[in-house]
């Protein structure tokens, strides 16, 4: 039952993409901020809109009704949802190395490179500069930080590039470093996105900042050359080449 799982009827309706039903529940007084599992409806929309959960490739729920997810998001905020609410427990988003705690809906929309939702959230008053508990920025997350399965996680390279451009247009710091030593360039390397690597370089990502080991000893180049993911070593030769092309312009002193 819903009570046994900790789910509310509103969360169950959203989780099945029954947004019209969810809208009726709001009209009947459902709490738009109830988060019995550590995440609220405003967060849940981010992984319902862009499924393809890392490592599972599950399809999105089919849903029903005449109300779409963006229209419902507006209704949710109009009904009193805290648009900058932060996740307190890890949500069911599949394999991901990203610390979801402290994440807002905007940061989680950046995780799936969902620019339409990112724009709507900002239009509705979201703070696009809120970080997670590790001080990872939405820009880092948009670039690919937390990627669990390159090529399987939500967000194509083109979508990620658009999300990165949008985050930068909002004044995100391209040279920010989180408490684990990660940068946006680490994110692009983890997600194996050479075009994003090149774009971050073009936009002023400082080599002296990103060409450093993070807390687990990974530089962007090492990530691209190959790191352990489960039982396998996963690499990306095109991402490796993109990073080397940048490093070759700035040879180390002899």
Show which residues each predicted segment covers.
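Start-of-repeat signature of ankyrin repeats
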Residues: 6, 38, 90, 102, ...
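Ankyrin repeat A-helix N-terminal signature
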Residues: 12-18, 44-69, 95-101, 108-114, ...
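Ankyrin repeat domain, specifically the short helix-to-loop turn at the C-terminus of the second helix
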Residues: 23-31, 74-82, 119-127, 162-173, ...
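Ankyrin repeat boundary/linker residues
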Residues: 2-3, 35-36, 87, 99, ...
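Leucine-rich solenoid repeat scaffolds
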Residues: 210-253
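Eukaryotic tandem repeat interaction scaffolds
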Residues: 131-147, 152-181
């Amino acid at each position: 039952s819903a009570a046994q799982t900790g789910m509310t009827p509103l969360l169950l309706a959203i989780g099945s993409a029954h947004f019209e039903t969810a809208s009726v529940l709001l009209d009947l007084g459902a709490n738009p901020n109830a988060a019995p599992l550590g995440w609220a409806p405003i967060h849940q929309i981010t992984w319902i809109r862009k499924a393809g959960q890392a490592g599972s490739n599950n399809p999105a729920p089919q849903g029903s009704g005449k109300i779409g997810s963006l229209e419902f998001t507006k209704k949710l905020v109009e009904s009193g949802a805290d648009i900058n609410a932060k996740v307190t427990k890890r949500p069911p988003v599949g394999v991901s190395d990203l610390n979801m705690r402290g994440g807002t809906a905007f940061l989680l929309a950046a995780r799936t490179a969902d620019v339409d939702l990112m724009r709507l959230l900002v239009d509705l008053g979201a703070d696009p500069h809120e970080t997670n508990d590790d001080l990872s920025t939405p820009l880092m997350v948009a670039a690919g930080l937390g990627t669990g399965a390159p090529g399987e996680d939500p967000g194509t390279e083109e979508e990620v590039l658009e999300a990165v451009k949008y985050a930068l247009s909002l004044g995100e710091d391209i040279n920010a470093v989180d408490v684990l030593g990660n940068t946006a360039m680490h994110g692009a390397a983890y997600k194996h996105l050479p075009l994003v690597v090149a774009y971050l370089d073009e936009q002023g990502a400082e080599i002296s900042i990103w060409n450093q080991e993070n807390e687990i000893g990974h530089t962007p180049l090492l990530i691209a050359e190959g790191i352990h993911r489960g039982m396998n070593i996963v690499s990306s030769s095109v991402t490796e080449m993109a990073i080397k092309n940048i490093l070759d312009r700035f040879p180390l002193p002899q």
